[in-house]
A protein has these predicted regions:
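A nucleotide-sugar donor-handling region in carbohydrate enzymes
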Residues: 1-43
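Structural beta-sheet core signal
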Residues: 30, 64-66, 138
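Structural motif
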Residues: 27, 63, 116-117
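Short catalytic/ligand-binding loop motif for oxyanion handling, primarily in non-cytosolic enzymes
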Residues: 36-40, 72-76, 128
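A donor-sugar binding/catalytic signature common to diverse glycosyltransferases
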Residues: 103-144
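Short hydrophobic signal-anchor/transmembrane segments that target glycosyltransferases
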Residues: 43-61
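Catalytic donor nucleotide-activated moiety binding site of glycosyltransferases and closely related
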Residues: 59-104
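Residue-level signal for short, function-critical loop segments
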Residues: 34, 70, 142
């Protein structure tokens, strides 16, 4: 599917995306990757925490579609165990609150087509996203606000 209308969107995602009047919020693909984790460690997890807070405050207008690298948790377990607990807590809170979408499916194309803009770490997804012509902003872990 290359158009939003053709996508198979889960009902729980639509619950996050649709406004009360039936129109759609702007959807931001938030992609978090392994290279940034390995470079920035605790600071990277702190950045995610701040990003989630900002998007939660703006959830009436913006739907966040958080898509972490599929190997992020196993990488933390083996290479950065000191950040795993805080990361897992953030992930579980995000999912439990239900104001955003947590996408751990294999279907990266759906996330790219569905979203209106990309925010997050530099990764192979950026190359894919660039082909859409939609806005891309790479997060800077050094800037916390």
């Amino acid at each position: 599917a290359t158009k939003k209308e053709e996508l198979n969107i889960p009902q729980e995602w639509l619950h996050v995306i649709e406004k009360a009047d039936g129109s759609w919020k702007k959807i931001i693909l938030y992609n978090t990757g392994i290279a940034a984790l390995l470079t920035h460690n605790e600071k990277w997890v702190g950045k995610i925490e701040n990003v989630l807070k900002i998007f939660e405050e703006n959830q009436d207008e913006i739907a966040l579609l958080w898509r972490p690298h599929p190997l992020i948790e196993s990488t933390m377990k083996s290479m950065r165990p000191e950040v795993l607990q805080k990361y897992m807590m953030l992930k579980q809170q995000y999912i439990a609150k239900g104001w955003g979408i947590y996408d751990e499916t294999a279907d990266v194309d759906r996330a790219v087509v569905l979203s209106d803009a990309y925010y997050g770490d530099g990764s192979s997804v950026v190359q894919l996203y660039r082909q859409t012509g939609k806005p891309i902003m790479i997060q800077n872990v050094e800037i916390m606000t």
